[in-house]
Each structure stands twice: as C-alpha cells, then as structure tokens.
C-alpha cells in the first residue's frame, strides 16, 4: 500500500533500524515525483554508512540532511536546507522517528537518574515538538495545494500533509499493568506518553489546516533498541506501518495505532 504515499517526505533517525528501513522502502515504492529527506546526526559518520550507500542507489531520490533533534540550531539548519529544495510544493509527510532510551534495559527506578529523564525527554518529546513547529509552514504549504483529496469528504491524508510520530505500546497508561513487566524503562515510556499528548494536541490545532497527526507503534522490532529477542523484523514492521499510513484519514488524526492499524488506548 505504500505506493499511495508520495510527495516530499522527511524522516528523522535514519542511520539505522526502523528509520533506515523507512527510507529504503519509501525509495523503492514511491514514484519519481517523490523525494525523501533522510535525517541523521552525523551524515558523514561511520554509523551512517548504510544510509549513504542507500542514497547512492537512488540518486536524485534521497537527500541526506544533518539533524540533531535535541539541538534547536540543528533543526533550524535542517529546515533551511529542506526549504531550499522543496520550494512551493511544501512538505507532505513528516515522520518523527528519532528517539533514544536511557539507561540500559530494564531501566528500573533505582537505575534511572534525573539526567536520563531529561535527556530522553529532550530528544523524544522536545525534538518532535520543535520539528513540527519549525516545519509547520512547509506542511501548511502542502496542505493548501490542490490535491485530489481536497475535494473528498476525508480531507486529511499522508499524501497531502501529515505528521507521524513513532510511539510505542508501552506509552499506553491503560496498558501499563500488562507491559510493565516487559521492561520498566521509566524515561522511555513516560517520554512516549508525552509524545502521545503532543500528537493529540497538534491534531486538534491543525485540523482546521487539514494536517493529519497520528502516533504509530511499530511493534516490538529487532533493532539495537528492541533487542534480538524481538519477534518483528524492521522490514515487516515498516511494510505494515507504510500500509497503515497510506490509509489514514480524518478519523485517525489524534489516534495511537499499531503497525497493523489497530487502535491502542491512551
């Protein structure tokens, strides 16, 4: 279903894991009219080698952007770089994927300090907040352009103008009694709960602009953060998420869904 996604798409945290796979599948499954802006902290670093290799496979389709989501100046620089290329078309889809987790699993109360809480919050919540705030003019520009969706009852879509915040099942307050035994992860789960509120607030604020805002749980994925015991590959998770993104509409804005499209309670 990801072939339904198109336009200018920006993804954060793309040097590895889910972010890298998002860029890969978007490059494979979107048309020539699409362009992917792949953001990471150190585009020239060793950890971004796979991303650089991917960009060379799709010349003119992928642009790597230097971005540290915990640094406001870095975000401003990324906005300027993307704006120069996008022009009047605007930004159709912003995927806030970059996130960190501290301390190491299981992230118990005893092992967690104030510094851990603040660093995780800065990247996982303040970062997406600032990204949306600074990229909003480009998102609005895309939303205001004439598109086939504009004349339909469902005016919102990821093809028009949308923000996707990558969240997690363990952000759910209602599900906490079921998930707490899996991993306590105090900083991570509380930061993602805050990200969910950010999703809900922005969905309310931006609905008059026809900008969709949805949180998506990618599943328990076999990544550096998810660990080797995770049942899902990045490929399967991203296939599912892109299918969900391609079908989102007004009714899904402000919601928390999983990679298969199932609703998760707050």
Region roles according to the model:
Residues 12-15, 19-25:
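N-terminal Rossmann NAD(P)H-binding glycine-rich loop of SDR-like oxidoreductase domains
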Residues 54-73:
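Rossmann-fold cofactor-recognition segment
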Residues 208, 215-218, 223, 227-266:
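C-terminal helical subdomain
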Residues 27-48:
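Conserved glycine-rich Rossmann-like NAD(P)H-binding loop of the short-chain dehydrogenase/reductase
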Residues 12, 89-101, 124, 164-167, ...:
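Rossmann-fold scaffold of SDR-type NAD(P)-dependent oxidoreductases
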Residues 45, 67-80:
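The beta1-alpha1 cofactor-binding region of Rossmann-like NAD(H)/NADP(H)-dependent oxidoreductases
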Residues 59-63, 81-96, 102-105, 250:
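A glycine-rich helix->loop->beta "capping" turn
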Residues 100-102, 107-121, 126, 136-207:
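Catalytic loop of short-chain dehydrogenase/reductase
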